[in-house]
């Protein structure tokens, strides 16, 4: 079986979860099963719940992981909703979310993620109603400007939005190739990534509501208050990493009083656990040589030791 995607930070993921023995493991973003396959092999006492919103990826992984069929349950869902759908929440001992786009999605022309694609789609869940085509051709100039500024952190977001609106007034933009030509190949000051790449990334985030999905997922976990469970999240965008970092920081605090208050009044017992990774973990030099797409990957991990399940 030809594997269409290389899992990032595989050794680092194994290290984070190396002490897990029994219970349930939730792979929130199964993809093509690389992380789960390795963990299934190394942790025979664990049962797995594998989730992905991409039907193609899910079908592939079902075949890839068929030897573990008695230990794994598959669910098609966005990872922000999967915790609502599963049982055995109290037995969760490990949770992994790799929230990047897979190589298969990037390289598949029909999915419309690549700047070279003949399509304009970018939906991770192909049943979703809004695609990149709708965003590019139907959003107002103000909406596009906001997307490019907030998600792409582009200084000339207004100018790019204006160019898109001008071109689509002549003819609707039907492919990623066309969009790439409109935006141009230039780079933003002090950044190695092209403006087009940043703009495409911003559109993809909007199409899939990626930041909202991440916040919803972390918010649900905060309310769930797992116990004796390790959470690891791999992100590929500074905005996502910032969200994860801030949630972990919040969860690790015992005192939640306003900083202006001189003496604690909250009880000083609100911590959900400890941050495992003092700083984000990035790909090794060896991995970068084998898989250049791992260059943006950052992993952070948190241990929920909420023994009283407050």
UniProtKB/Swiss-Prot annotation:
InterPro entries xref list: RsmH (IPR002903), SAM-dep_MeTrfase_MraW_recog (IPR023397), SAM-dependent_MTases_sf (IPR029063)
EC number(s) stated in the UniProt entry for this protein: 2.1.1.199
UniProt entry keywords in alphabetical sequence: Cytoplasm, Methyltransferase, rRNA processing, S-adenosyl-L-methionine, Transferase
Gene3D superfamilies in the record: Putative methyltransferase TM0872, insert domain, Vaccinia Virus protein VP39
Enzyme class: transferase
Binding site for S-adenosyl-L-methionine: 33-35, 52, 79, 98, 105
GO BP terms, alphabetized: rRNA base methylation
GO annotation, cellular component aspect: cytoplasm
Highest rank taxon of the organism: Bacteria
Subcellular location: Cytoplasm
Catalyzed chemical reaction(s): cytidine(1402) in 16S rRNA + S-adenosyl-L-methionine = N(4)-methylcytidine(1402) in 16S rRNA + S-adenosyl-L-homocysteine + H(+)
Gene Ontology molecular-function annotations: rRNA (cytosine-N4-)-methyltransferase activity
Chief location category: cytoplasm
HAMAP family: 16SrRNA_methyltr_H (MF_01007)
Similarity comment: Belongs to the methyltransferase superfamily. RsmH family.
Main function: Specifically methylates the N4 position of cytidine in position 1402 (C1402) of 16S rRNA.
Entries under NCBIfam families matching the protein: 16S rRNA (cytosine(1402)-N(4))-methyltransferase RsmH
Protein name per its UniProtKB record: Ribosomal RNA small subunit methyltransferase H
Organism: Campylobacter jejuni subsp. doylei (strain ATCC BAA-1458 / RM4099 / 269.97)
């Amino acid at each position: 079986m030809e594997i269409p995607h290389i899992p990032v930070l595989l050794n680092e993921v194994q290290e984070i979860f190396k002490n897990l023995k029994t219970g349930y493991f939730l792979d929130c973003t199964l993809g093509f099963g690389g992380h789960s396959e390795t963990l299934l092999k190394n942790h025979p006492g664990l049962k797995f719940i594998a989730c992905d919103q991409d039907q193609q990826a899910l079908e592939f992984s079902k075949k890839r992981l068929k030897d573990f069929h008695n230990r794994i349950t598959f669910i098609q869902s966005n990872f922000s909703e999967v915790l609502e759908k599963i049982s055995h929440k109290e037995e969760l001992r490990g949770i992994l979310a790799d929230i990047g786009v897979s190589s298969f999605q990037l390289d598949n022309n029909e999915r419309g993620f690549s700047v070279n694609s003949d399509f304009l789609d970018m939906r991770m869940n192909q049943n979703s109603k809004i695609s990149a085509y709708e965003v590019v051709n139907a959003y107002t100039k103000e909406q596009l400007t906001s997307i490019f500024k907030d998600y792409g952190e582009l200084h000339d977001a207004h100018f790019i939005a204006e160019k898109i609106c001008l071109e689509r007034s002549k003819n609707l933009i039907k492919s990623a190739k066309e969009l790439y030509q409109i935006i141009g190949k230039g780079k933003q000051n002090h950044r190695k990534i092209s403006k087009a790449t940043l703009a495409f990334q911003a559109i993809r985030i909007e199409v899939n509501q990626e930041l909202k999905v991440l916040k919803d997922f972390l918010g649900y976990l905060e309310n769930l208050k797992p116990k004796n469970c390790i959470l690891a999240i791999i992100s590929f965008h500074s905005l996502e990493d910032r969200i994860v970092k801030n949630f972990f920081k919040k969860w690790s605090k015992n005192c939640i009083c306003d900083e202006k208050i001189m003496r604690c009044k909250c009880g000083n017992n609100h911590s959900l656990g400890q941050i495992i990774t003092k700083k984000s973990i990035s790909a090794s030099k060896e991995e970068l040589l084998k898989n250049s797409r791992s260059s943006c990957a950052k992993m952070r991990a948190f241990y929920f030791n909420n023994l009283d399940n407050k």
